[in-house]
Amino acid sequence: MKIRPLHDRVIIKRTEVEAKSAGGIVLTGSAAQKSTRGEVLAVGTGRILDNGEVKALAVKVGDKVIFNEGYGVKTEKLDGQEVLILSETDILAIVEE
């Protein structure tokens, strides 16, 4: 199945980051929080401005991002894999390596 996001929506695959306590112990299960990092799988056509123009999104497919997982973030299954659908405004940063 293929999902194509609309407007300023972005589809992200969460990337798991190893969680460690302050003392260096690796946390697992319920002690570890879900990562707020991911990889952009698809982007919409852009944000529609008040004057009707479409502004292209700053993120692109393949970008590694840090996002805010809050209200408005939708979780879906895509080919058996969990993906997130969110607005570009929920993306806090692009990670450059």
From Swiss-Prot:
Keywords: Chaperone, Cytoplasm
Localisation: Cytoplasm
Domain of life: Bacteria
An individual GO BP term: chaperone cofactor-dependent protein refolding
UniProt GO molecular function: ATP binding; metal ion binding; protein folding chaperone; protein-folding chaperone binding; unfolded protein binding
GO cellular component, one term: cytoplasm
Pfam families: Cpn10
Principal cellular location given in the protein's record: cytoplasm
CDD domains per record: cpn10
Record flagged with keyword tRNA-binding: no
PROSITE patterns reported in the protein's UniProt record: CHAPERONINS_CPN10 (PS00681)
Keyword S-adenosyl-L-methionine among UniProt keywords: no
InterPro entries, per the entry: Chaperonin_GroES, Chaperonin_GroES_sf, Chaprnonin_Cpn10_CS, GroES-like_sf
Assembly description: Heptamer of 7 subunits arranged in a ring. Interacts with the chaperonin GroEL.
UniProt record similarity statement: Belongs to the GroES chaperonin family.
Known function: Together with the chaperonin GroEL, plays an essential role in assisting protein folding. The GroEL-GroES system forms a nano-cage that allows encapsulation of the non-native substrate proteins and provides a physical environment optimized to promote and accelerate protein folding. GroES binds to the apical surface of the GroEL ring, thereby capping the opening of the GroEL channel.
HAMAP family hit by this protein: CH10
Name by which UniProt lists this protein: Co-chaperonin GroES
